Amino acid sequence: MIKKSVLKHSIHVNTKAHIQCVKEAIAQGFPQERTHTKDESRQLVRKLQSRAVKAYKDYPWIACVKVSECDEAISKERAIQATEMALHIIRILLGAKPTREIRLAWSRSGALRSAHLHADVHGVIHASLCADSLEPVGVINWHEVLIRANLELDILGSALIPIVNPVETTHLHQRLIDAINWFGDAVTDSNVHSSIVKYVSAIERLFFGKFEAGRTKLFAGRVRDVLKAFNCDEEHRVYTKALELYKTRSALVHGEQFRTEDESFNSINIASELSRMCLLCSAQLYSMMLQAFENPNNAKLEEIMKRINDEGLNWLAEAAALGCVKHSPIR
C-alpha cells in the first residue's frame, strides 16, 4: 500500500510541474484566461491521483517492477515490457485459452457487450446477446500450477533479467525472448490468421539457425524430434500436426482464408499447443545447449538440431553434464 506521505509529496511535486507547464504555455502566447489557476492545478492533480488510486484498488493484482538506473522514459518503457513478458510467460505455463483475457489494464480489449440479429428464410428475426467478463481469468489454482512448473518458470523467467537490468544476453537467450514475445502476441491477437503465423514464428525462432528450402517437412521433423525427446509425443501425432500447421501457415501467408469457423478453431488450437510445448521443452533444451557449448551461435544451433534429428538427445545431455563439471568452480 502506498503511504499517504508519499501521495501528498507526489501531489506537491506534480502540482508544481503543472503550474510550470501553464506558465510556459502563457509565455508562448496561450490565452491566460483559458489556463488553470494555481488552485485549479492543485485540484486537477489531486483528482487525477485520487481516480487512479481508486482504479488500482479494484485491480485483482498489481505488477511492481524495479528497473536499474537509467533515463526515466526508458525505465518506464522497460517496466511495461517486463510486465508484458511476465504475462506471456504465464500464458506459456498455463496455456493460451485460459489466459487469453489476462492483459495490462490499458491494453485494448474486445467489446464487453455485443448483439447479433439475423433473419431466417421465413423472415423471422432471431436475436442473441453476448457479455464478456474479464474476471476471473486463468485457472483457479494458477499459483500452484506455476510452482509445480518451477524449473520452466526459472528458465523462462530469466528472460526478464536483461529487460530490467540491461546486460549482454547470449544468442540463445535472445532467441528465447523473441519466441516468448511471439507466443504472447499470438495469444492476444484477435485475428486468427496472424495469430497462427505468430505461433509458427515462435517455433521457428527456437529451432532454426538458418533458412533452408523444403522447410515444411523439416519444420515438422524438428518439432517431432524435440517433443519426442522430452516424452511429449506419446500418441505419435506431433509430426502430422506440425506438418499440417506449417502448410496452413504457408497458405495464410499467401492470402488463403479459412472456409469454416471449425477449421480455424482446430488450426488455432493445434498452433497454440505445439508452440507452447516447444517453448516448455526449449526451456530445458536451451539450458543443456548453454551448459554444453557456452554460447552457441546460429550455425551451432543448426548443427545441434540436425544432430538431435540423427541421434536423439542423450548425446547433448552427456555433453551438458561434462560442461557443468568443466565450468564448475569446485573440482
Sequence positions of predicted segments:
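Charged, non-catalytic interaction/linker regions at domain boundaries
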Residues: 1-194, 201, 266-268, 273, ...
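Glycine- and acidic
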Residues: 68, 181-187, 228-232, 256-261
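A glycine-rich, aromatic-flanked flexible loop/lid motif
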Residues: 172-173, 212-223, 238-250
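Short, hydrophobic/aromatic alpha-helical segments in well-folded domains
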Residues: 182-185, 198, 241, 248
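Short, surface-exposed helix-loop/turn micro-motifs enriched in polar/charged residues
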Residues: 191-195, 214-215, 260-263
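Flexible secondary-structure boundary motifs
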Residues: 198-236
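Charged/polar positions within long, soluble alpha-helices
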Residues: 211, 250-258, 280-291
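Histidine-centered, metal-coordinating catalytic motifs and their short helical/loop contexts
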Residues: 235-265
